[in-house]
């Protein structure tokens, strides 16, 4: 018998509530629909400063540690963590360090790969899929800003 399962979408965070709802919130709903609402899907931010700002605005969200603790306390046995980082950089390393502290809490705790987690991912298909997503949203919104930043680790090879 399969125990209670959850997907935890993990990002650095944003203090823009509308931005959260129109990005990672949509992804959360899509995953819930995909699994016919049989799997709990939650969002966690790794930035404690962002989480604190959101709490002051009355927006309920947990940091990664709080989410893992809550899932454990609620009897979840299998948790899939999907980082919402483009590449395997510093934030992903921090995520792995935190997750390692909670491995014994669950029968299965898996961290999935980032969109461009490995060099083999820098291929035409992945780039075309990313371009398709941008095109889809450009039909609804007149302006789209794509932003990113570098990393001090070697995976910053894009």
Where are these regions (language model features)?
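Extended amphipathic ligand-handling, pore-lining, and cofactor/metal-binding catalytic surfaces
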Residues: 1-158
């Amino acid at each position: 018998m399969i125990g209670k399962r959850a997907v935890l979408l993990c990002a650095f965070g944003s203090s823009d509530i509308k931005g959260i709802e129109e990005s990672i919130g949509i992804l959360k709903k899509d995953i819930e629909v995909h699994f016919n609402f049989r799997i709990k899907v939650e969002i966690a931010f790794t930035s404690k400063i962002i989480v604190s700002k959101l709490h002051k605005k009355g927006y309920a969200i947990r940091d990664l540690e709080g989410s893992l603790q809550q899932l454990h306390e609620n009897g979840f046995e299998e948790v899939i963590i999907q980082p919402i980082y483009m590449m395997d950089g510093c934030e992903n390393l921090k995520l792995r360090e935190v997750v390692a502290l909670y491995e014994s809490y669950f029968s299965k705790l898996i961290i999935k790969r980032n969109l461009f987690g490995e060099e083999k991912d820098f291929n035409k298909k992945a780039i075309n899929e990313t371009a398709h997503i941008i095109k889809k949203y450009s039909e609804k919104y007149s302006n789209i800003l794509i932003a990113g930043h570098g990393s001090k680790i070697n995976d910053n090879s894009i």
